Each structure stands twice: as C-alpha cells, then as structure tokens.
UniProtKB/Swiss-Prot annotation:
Family the UniProt entry places it in: Belongs to the tachykinin family.
Domain of life according to the entry: Eukaryota
Primary localization: secreted
Chain positions found as Methionine amide: 16
Disulphide-bonded residues: none
Intracellular or extracellular location(s): Secreted
Organism listed in the record: Torpedo marmorata (Marbled electric ray)
Record's keyword terms, sorted: Amidation, Neuropeptide, Secreted
Name the UniProt record assigns to this protein: Des[Ser(1)Pro(2)] scyliorhinin-2
GO cellular component: extracellular region
Any one biological process term the GO annotation gives: neuropeptide signaling pathway
InterPro entries xref list: Tachy_Neuro_lke_CS
Keyword Secreted: yes
Source organism phylogeny: Eukaryota, Metazoa, Chordata, Craniata, Vertebrata
Length: 16
C-alpha cells in the first residue's frame, strides 16, 4: 500500500 493514501478504492483513484 502507498503511505501517501489510505488502503481502499479512494487510494487507487487518487493515483490515477
């Protein structure tokens, strides 16, 4: 998981 975002779909959306 990325330390810049919490685990979850929101994290993936932020990376896109």
């Amino acid at each position: 998981s990325n330390s810049k975002c919490p685990d979850g779909p929101d994290c993936f959306v932020g990376l896109m």
